[in-house]
């Protein structure tokens, strides 16, 4: 069927900010879809609230709205644009839920807007647990024994009938949000209550647990003519019971017989056909390892995280094909862009093994509950490709960037046998490394399989890796064992450890003996047809399929897996850098390990290498390609951390040179640079042991800010107020040594602001100055940022411009740099300089109209700012006000304290733009799901040092008609100052205490600040935890609460008697 001509304009809904369970894969999918629709001649309108996306660039759609993804705002855009159709299936769970909501309001019918891709009935059948259960019964597809509940009492009754364990699955939620495995009544009460609260339709499925079965996924496509195919099948390393987003996953499935594969394939195709889905769909199934019995677990009637993985694993562009199916094209009418010959109806075939490994945030959140279950906790993932399971697994391990380069963790050898058993039975994020340790201690595959329910086949692969290690240890400096180990994915670094040599010694020996990787093409057809797409992975085999180009090329290093502190913003910068390289006449080569991102879409660069970002793997690509140079400054700290080793290997680093990178990152050199150009910074010093730390803190005075050097996202950064806390920090938070010094600075409580600057070595362009709403002490990534600044005097602005220029010139910056300032008593201090692109680049690019990463790349390649049409100094400011607001995923991470501080905790961001600060703030709060009504009840629980400041705030809320509740100390203070307050009991004082009030549903917001006192801290953490669980807007910074008050005041009318 030819494409539809009765529709001309299509609105695409994006997925909004990055949260756990919904990350960069939707930027990749949305970008592909918008470009595919434009390619077919449709007018595309995009709405998304996330500025850190390629999808929201002006070139991707005909009109782009970066507005809150709420029914209110999307309805306004629908009325303004009057599209013929709406495509919600590329916006994740957010897109689906929004489509449902818009349909319920009647606006789609009113405006005659058709829903494309997947009909509402299909969304309902897949997402509504009751309808899904009925459909599976009608299809005679087995599902676990289950019941739909709308109350905790119903859940308890059903569990008493079928027995524990049971799994709770809330309807219409993302990444298993609110769900979990329950083994008793107490757990079931708790998880069901949360699940019902988080489900937009107040519905949960309680099902008999089948934890321990194999978990298999099928990524399927279907068109309007009922043509359907399986793009990819995947098998989880972990059994059912651990969310697939938190599991290691292999593609294709490794342990299925042909009969089992056909059984599950047929079931998946039957389901997509019954749902009449037009586009992509993900089917998750559980297979009994001891029989042919299987169960259907879940169906996602949309493009998902697994779709992105399947696309990158096979090369089949699922989102692009899904978008074209939505406008009427059929699978047998579309050419597969990888081969350029076969049709999209042709099922991909793989002659390699893909491993996906999740990246967890527990290096940031040491207090978090690391146990894995049905609720997702990973922030990102890596993918690796090899010819064997062992090779792809070991490549994935060293892609994670968690300080390991093999499937082992050295510290685990110190764990006693009893603890090791517990770590194996109760799965955590690091179970893979405990499995390796258990095998080293002589545990058998059968024993481990019994304990973990992991298939013996996978455990045998781990044992094989161990056998290769032993062989290497016995036969040092021999060619055959080295070659054998490289074929199975061993890194030079691991071999160096086993041979007691340096990594460079192993590399030299390897090259001397002709042991080099070859690069194979990802072609969707197992080399049956010639492929046109230069998308490669390394392996140690015969025949290299990647030939170095005769044209001049530049290698750009990506930023690896998404984690807190280094997110999608860096991928945005990478993609823009590639565009500029190509525009300058060079071939652009990307190297990255993240399957979720736009940068690893094979159509973005001239060549894509899907490889770990380690010195060894990068040098292997450089040896083959011989690029003119390597660009590091868009790959976040991942790429910057490789600079020194690449420089030592005489690799040309383009942009700011390594010696100047070191002058910005090394504390003593940086202090000298600031001193030389007469720029003030907080008093501070580098220390290498506990005694030095105490001496420095005593000299500069408490409070102090302590942090390790060379980190991103403020990892392990703390404000310390007393000597005892400083010692605790030095002993537990960091590994301190002369190689890994700790920085101790005087903590200045002032107005924080930051600048992204672009320099050609002569002139310095400052696109704009961002002013933080929260005072210094809250990490810049967790602060709300306003552009243009609203409260900085002209003198302060001029000083910031002056200091930025001086720093850029002194540090010989070529390209981008980010500088953070704090202003106190009219003095501007420099807190930090990052000699690279920062996470604010997409935001500032969008609000100023300057394609910052492209401009910086052109400067790196030799252009000047003047040649590009830019002047030295501050760029003209925007007529609108723009607010960037952070997004957190605390509801997925139990036991993580949501109190904001110097260590970054946010996973994503949104933007609010309008003609005034109040309107922009309102949009930013709405986009970040911080909806506070015009009146209601608000709780204040405030530390002593903040009571005076909070009084003015409480009076403001009271004047608007809010009823003020406060814990005893705060209440007494408010009453002394004539503010009417309802006193509530602290935790444990009486039965009707603060937590019960919060669970009652009568509270509209909680304002909580904390002291460093241990008892207060525990109570405060519990209050914050309950607020997050109950979905109550929580403010832990008075500055953020003041911003919300300002919004509410701007929307209220004054009411006065005569």
UniProtKB/Swiss-Prot annotation:
EC number in record: 6.3.4.16, 6.3.5.5
Question: Residue ranges of region Allosteric domain?
Answer: 930-1058
Using the UniProt annotation, give all residue ranges assigned to the region (Carboxyphosphate synthetic domain): 1-401
SMART domains attached to this UniProt entry: CPSase_L_D3, MGS
Give the UniProt record's GO annotations in the biological process aspect.
Answer: 'de novo' UMP biosynthetic process; glutamine metabolic process; L-arginine biosynthetic process
Region annotated Carbamoyl phosphate synthetic domain sits at 547-929
Residues noted as binding Mg(2+) 2 in the record, renumbered to the chain = 298, 300
Q: Where does Mn(2+) 3 bind?
A: 820, 832
Q: What class of enzyme is it?
A: ligase
Instruction: Report the sequence similarity comment from the record.
Output: Belongs to the CarB family.
What is the official name of this protein in its record? Carbamoyl phosphate synthase large chain
Species this protein is from: Streptococcus uberis (strain ATCC BAA-854 / 0140J)
- What is the primary gene name for this protein? carB
